[in-house]
């Protein structure tokens, strides 16, 4: 099927690919439930609604039904440490699910699954709108397929906030690339209250603003590294906002095409010989040219460079952003950073404990928050106090190789900065466990970087999709199903 010229609307194609991938995940999830032993949450072979209620799904249910503890109800152990509580879970997803359950007088988990599926569909559309101008229609559809068939993608249809959070991030970046700053701010603020991603979001936007300020001053705009973020491809079929993108693309190509000298020569050679006509009269002798003036001629101004087509994403532009765009970008970054700090502030106000939010987040690991320390300790637990350091070094090298991939950089400056900031955020603050696979869903552009390489190689693409489905089977069995086989991990 030629997706570039298909009569089916592209968004419907995206939803079709998403639906097929999600239904495969649903089948795997339900089959995995048949092998699930008795757990803390249910008896063996749980029903679908019992199965989706495992792990942190219960915490979102508590947020929806009990809210957040105050200074009296905040759990504090005998050692003075804050215990596990709902402040670790942002409110928007839980309140949406709980509000829908009250409105319909329905089961909470039924409504939570509905919200998760809707969020997953929005995430597919948002990711396509973000990535399509950078990779084209065909590669973007393949990116949707690759992403939604990867192992932890099943979590996007379960009662977790991941699907809604990812949708808000993707939509925010998509509209920001089109200079819709106000809508981007709305999306990023909502995302900061859906998942704890406000810090890397604000950092990514702030670093991009600094980058653009340096480019505008000519400090890095001529570097080869900066040039590597400007794709040499213009995907005229990719703009998700302009209704006339095909006409705009044709106009842009026509305005930038060189003069066809061969055609001009051919037309001259086939022109009729006017001198053979009886009515031909000799031309008068040419006038003697006037002596050159002492005043040098004024040179004609150099032709202005061709403007980029309106559908070029803002962070792919080879030219620095305007001062107006940079100002709006700074405001967007500032608003996002403020949103990231608001939730810890609300926890402080409600509990009277300044570090209530951070203490809650670290309650699951049992130690205070220290940058990078969790990765060092975890590497020691996996490989030993000495050999584990080598494993940690390997993780850092692998991270550098992935983030330095040229194909990822060609998705745009902001896309690359976001992936770097979020990845570094996990390395600094996250306690590594099998949950890291779920956390890495936020660097979804990696799937589109892979898709660009595979879009013209159908066998390789099919192999990658098959591996993705296999990892979903392993994720359900090893991670979600709580010991259905010998390996016990947590989502």
Predicted regions and their residues:
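Short hydrophobic/aromatic helix or loop-helix immediately within or flanking a transmembrane segment
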Residues: 55-105, 371-376
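Membrane-lumen/periplasm interface segments of specific transmembrane helices
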Residues: 22-37, 204-252, 266-268, 309, ...
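Signature aromatic-anchored transmembrane alpha helix within multi-pass, membrane-resident enzymes
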Residues: 334-337, 456-484
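Membrane-interface alpha helices of multi-pass inner-membrane proteins
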Residues: 148, 169-174, 182-209, 335-338, ...
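Transmembrane-helix motifs of polytopic, lipid-linked glycan transferases
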Residues: 98-99, 111-134, 399-404
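Transmembrane-helix signature of polytopic, membrane-embedded enzymes
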Residues: 107-111, 127-149, 167, 417
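Short acidic/glycine- and proline-prone juxtamembrane loop motifs at membrane-interface regions
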Residues: 158-164, 436-437
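Membrane-interface transmembrane helices that cradle and orient dolichyl/undecaprenyl
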Residues: 172-183, 215, 219, 454
